């Protein structure tokens, strides 16, 4: 945008409705130029104006005070910031809820694994004890069979 001097006593209410914020183009598609007012009512006040408006004064082309446009822009940015803060708050709440759910599930899985491991450990302990008894019985049987064999050999030796 360029800056020019322009004699203007127009107010924003006398022209076509402008889009909020800082305009980039007029409704007709022309670029916007920044001018400085030289009127007694608005001395050195800057405004945006369509380049064609200078040539076609009977048509209603874009006119907007720079300070009003900047205020509109600030208001829009503030509203966007509020929406971003709300979105972040919502996101934070969702993340916290998910974290609580994950912690609850992790604790539940840990408890289930501990119970399962305790059950397996008890089963293994019982199996080891049973195996010990079986091995003890087996050892007694082996000793008994060995005694019978030795006694048979001694008896047979004695008969020979």
UniProtKB/Swiss-Prot annotation:
Keywords: Metal-binding, Zinc, Zinc-finger
Disulfide links within the chain: none
Stored InterPro entries: Znf_GRF
GO MF term (any one): zinc ion binding
First and last residues of each zinc finger (GRF-type): 26-69
Residues that, per the record, bind Zn(2+): 26, 28, 50, 61
Descriptive protein name: Uncharacterized protein At4g04775
């Amino acid at each position: 945008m360029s800056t020019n001097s322009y004699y203007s006593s127009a107010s924003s209410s006398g022209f076509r409705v402008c889009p909020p914020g800082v305009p980039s183009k007029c409704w007709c598609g022309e670029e916007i130029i920044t001018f400085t007012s030289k009127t007694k009512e608005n001395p050195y006040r800057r405004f945006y104006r369509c380049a064609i408006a200078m040539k076609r004064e009977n048509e209603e082309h874009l006119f907007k005070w720079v300070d009003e446009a900047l205020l509109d822009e600030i208001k829009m940015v503030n509203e966007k910031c509020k929406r971003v803060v709300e979105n972040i708050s919502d996101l934070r709440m969702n993340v916290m809820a998910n974290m609580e759910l994950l912690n609850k599930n992790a604790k539940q899985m840990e408890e289930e694994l501990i119970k399962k491991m305790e059950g397996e450990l008890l089963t293994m302990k019982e199996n080891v004890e049973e195996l010990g008894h079986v091995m003890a019985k087996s050892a007694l049987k082996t000793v008994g069979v060995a005694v019978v064999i030795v006694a048979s050999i001694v008896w047979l030796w004695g008969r020979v």
